[in-house]
Amino acid sequence: MAESNRAPSKQVRHFRQILLWPLQLMPIREGAQIQKHWEVLEQEREGNPWHEVLDEFTGDPGEFKERHYNEFVTFLPHVQRFLYGESRRAGDEAERGASPMRVFRREDVAAARLTRQAGDPPLTLNVAHVDLYFFFDIDVVLLAVEVFVDDLPLVIAEDVLYRFGRAYPAGWDEEGEGLHCMHKAEWLSAEGAVLAVSDYEKRDKYLSFACRHRAPCLAAHWAFLLRPLVLDHADERGVIRYRQIEYYRMPVMGYLAMDNPRTLSRGDFIRLGLVTAAGTDEALPYSDRHVADFEENFCYDRYWSDQVEERNTRYLCCGHALIAVGGAHSRVFTDRETGVFSQFRHQYFLLFLIAHFHKAALLMISDRLVDALNRLEVHNAESVKRFKRAIRQQFEIFLRFTHRYWFHELSDQAQSKALYRLCARHLGTDALFEEVQDEIQEMSDYLDSDSLRRQANTVMRLTIVTTFGLIGTLCTGFLGMNLIDAADNPLLERVLLFLLFLVPSVALILYFIVKSKQLSEFLEALSDERLPARAKLRTLTDVWRKRQRPFT
């Protein structure tokens, strides 16, 4: 086994893992642009374990620690407004200028008991946080689960990073075990009671669900953790419903404090940085050619050196994962107020969250555009109207997302700036932003051109009515306005004469509007000096010929 080929010194003195899973939220109020899903969680209902977490700025200033201050000043002012809300003076209302990000936490889950493979002893990880991150005006929620344990062999740490964050199995082996998943995962309460157990081995459950719904089914322990949020395709009742929007492997952060991080082999770093299965020291998870540029593309080695042992820290990032490896005896790496440990749980967690929030929000908007196109029935006038409203709504949401949430730079601190750029580059958020922007702009341009076309048609119809109405106006004006002297007639007779004139006038105007397109073609032909008289006459007779016209 891989464990037998590992040096006994490769122990992780403190291991910490944060899973961050973006999900798309379904509307709870049809027609409303802004869906405040968190308001449902604010209501005290039976079976709702979530409560809102107030940030450090709303509590007692005496509880405001140096790590909170360091986190705050790391970010640029526009990012601070996103994370913490607008700056305010004493006496200002708390709700005014509040952060557009809302955090909810459940505290009934105290530990995770994991069995990697059948026959292995279970491993119990402490649960630090289970949080949900909501964002104003964006129908995306991020589930964050933070676990930790001390004194863990490196091979097991690699396996936990690789296997733990799986929403459902990718397949099954010959024994019926879920591929690349934990053999068993359990959520435990503070008293040790089992709250939920994974069901990766239930092959028929996943196959039948995918066949019936054309969507994957979540493992039981992850579905439990999200309740009262429920999977949109499931038969389970729930007001807040979600859909998978990214890969079933949850983005992951890892913190590994080693006795001597310099003893890790190149294969160890590749397995950690690319989050692959555990292996031997000598073996690489991929071919030499495939990982030839690993250090250049996936490592941030600002403080990784033989000469600077106290600050020997290496960061690994592939977009899907952000891993920090350092010395367990280095205060710079382990200090809980100012060290890398604090930065990992605060600054780096937030920049990792923002990068994945950007990607999830863009994917959500793109998905909504595709959904609007799929619902469009071009021969149904009501469907066309709904399509136009949906596109304009997504255009407005995208504009608000751009101005409220989208930024290329989060910090001017060199390390935070570099790590965010590395993460965003691997996630491809800049290219995705341009792609979604182009999609929305193309649809918006089409709707604008269609609106101008309809306005031009309306002007044309009014012009036709005015042109042919001018004939009657000239005739009555030439012959005199008072063709019928009825001023002294009885009132009833005058009313009847008025109606006698009104009805055919309205009918004639409506007839001109109905025939306005054909009449405009006749007027255009009439003004064309190149057409012979017979062709112009044929154009006039075409006014009364029936022809099939496409829906516009």
Task: Give the location of each predicted region.
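Membrane-associated alpha-helical segments
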Residues: F344-D485
